[in-house]
Structures are given as C-alpha cells and as structure tokens.
C-alpha cells in the first residue's frame, strides 16, 4: 500500500487539493482517505464512508474552537487523531486499497501542532521524540511519501480569510471569531518551520520521499495535477527518501 499525505500550513489548500487528486486517482487505482470526511474511491467513483463521524467532529470542533481554551481544543484534536488512525487501519483491512491519501499526516501533524496547544509539554520533548510517540500511539505506519504545499504566510492568511468570508457570508460575528487559535501569522510561521524539520526527520528516520510544491502562484487545481501525475508514476513498492522541489 502506498501511504501518502498532502501536508502544509493552514491556508495551503490541503483539503481541496487532496479532494481533486482523489477524484482523478480513483479512476485507475483503489484509494481511501480516512479522516474528515472518510472517502473510498474505486472504478471512477468517490464515495463517503461512515458520514456521521465526520459530522460529529465538525460540530465538536466548531463549538470547542470558540472557547479559545488551548487544552480543551488540544484534547479534541487528540480524540480526532485517534479516530482517524483507527479508521485508516479499519479501511485498509476493509477495502484493501492501493493508495491511502490523507490531507494531513497522522504522525507529523499532531507532533507539530502540540507546540501550539501544549507549549509546556513541547519544551520538554524534541520534535523527533514527539513524532515517535505519536507513531506509537496511533499505530499507523510512517508515510511512503509526502506532498508538501509550501505557502508564504501572507498568502495563507489571505486564503484563510477568504475561506471564512465564503463559508460565513451572512454572519454577524467578526471574521476573527471564526479563526482557529493557530490561524495567525506568528503561529503559522512556527508551524511552517516545524514542518521543514519534521519532513527532514521523516526522510532520515522513516525513509519517506518528499515532493515540495510551491503554491505561491499555483492554485489547488495545478497542485493537484502535479500530485496526481506523480502518484500515477509511483510503483507500488516505492520506498525512497527522495527530495524533489517543483
């Protein structure tokens, strides 16, 4: 199984890019996407799987995020990571896919975002140790490869704010009300730096391949095209710690 992840800071277009890749990839490979939402693709058809869980987490995150309480928000993310890891293991057994593609990494992302939501704990543990702890807790294998959407902070913030205006056009609340706690330039800068380090560790520790895609001027459609073409050329036994920048 090729286990691949599209990663990047908030505002990089991970979710939209991943969805567009899946829509094309399912035409010639069996693919699953565990998470929010769970998706199964085969023979050109992409279908949701166990939708109530996705709805539950959407409502949970929306309500908890508005409390602005770091520990409470952090615990909901731990719950989701545990759930997503379980779904990956279950869906791999159930559907026997050729490709597992996620819009976050169940190992890297929790280790990185701990620094925002649990700064005290993060100061006592290196990023490498946090990654290894997350890998052991989730019980999912390291990713075969990563597609890192490199996005400048101003571009990411602009996309985040435009997303909020699109999702909540009639809201009486100020747009900052809808921002996640880490959706600010300072936090995003820290997250971006940690991704660089985490991906480097993934190459050396897990042998993961990395493709870095500059999304400064590329939209989600263009990034998805690059990713889809690359996956289509990967042999099922691919396992090389390559680093490619486009």
State each model region's role.
Residues 158-246:
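NTP-dependent small-molecule kinase module
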Residues 23-33:
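Post-Walker A helix-loop "phosphate-sensing" segment adjacent to the P-loop in P-loop NTPases
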Residues 14:
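Conserved lysine of the Walker
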Residues 9:
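P-loop (Walker A) phosphate-binding loop of NTP-binding proteins
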Residues 108-194:
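A glycine- and Lys/Arg-enriched "phosphate-lid" helix/loop adjacent to the NTP-binding pocket
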Residues 6:
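Hydrophobic anchor at the beta1->P-loop junction of P-loop NTPases
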């Amino acid at each position: 199984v090729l286990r691949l992840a599209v990663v990047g800071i908030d505002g990089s277009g991970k979710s939209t890019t991943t969805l567009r890749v899946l829509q094309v990839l399912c035409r010639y490979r069996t693919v699953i996407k565990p998470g929010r939402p769970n998706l199964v693709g085969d023979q050109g058809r992409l279908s949701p799987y166990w939708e109530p869980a996705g709805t539950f987490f959407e409502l949970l995150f929306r309500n908890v995020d508005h409390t602005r309480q770091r520990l409470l928000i952090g615990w909901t993310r731990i719950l989701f990571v545990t759930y997503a890891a379980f779904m990956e293991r279950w869906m791999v057994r159930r559907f026997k896919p050729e490709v597992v593609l996620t819009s976050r990494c169940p190992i890297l992302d929790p280790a990185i975002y701990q620094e925002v939501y649990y700064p005290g704990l993060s100061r006592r543990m290196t990023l490498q140790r946090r990654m290894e702890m997350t890998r052991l807790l989730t019980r999912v294998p390291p990713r075969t490869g990563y597609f890192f959407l490199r996005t400048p902070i101003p571009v990411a913030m602009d996309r985040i704010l435009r997303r909020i205006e699109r999702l909540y056009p009639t809201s009486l609340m100020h747009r900052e009300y809808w921002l996640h706690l880490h959706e600010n330039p300072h936090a995003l800068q820290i997250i971006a730096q940690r991704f660089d380090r985490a991906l480097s560790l993934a190459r050396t520790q897990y042998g993961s391949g990395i493709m870095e895609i500059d999304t400064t001027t590329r939209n989600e459609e263009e990034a998805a095209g690059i990713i889809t073409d690359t996956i289509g050329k990967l042999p099922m036994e691919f396992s090389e710690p390559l680093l490619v920048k486009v």
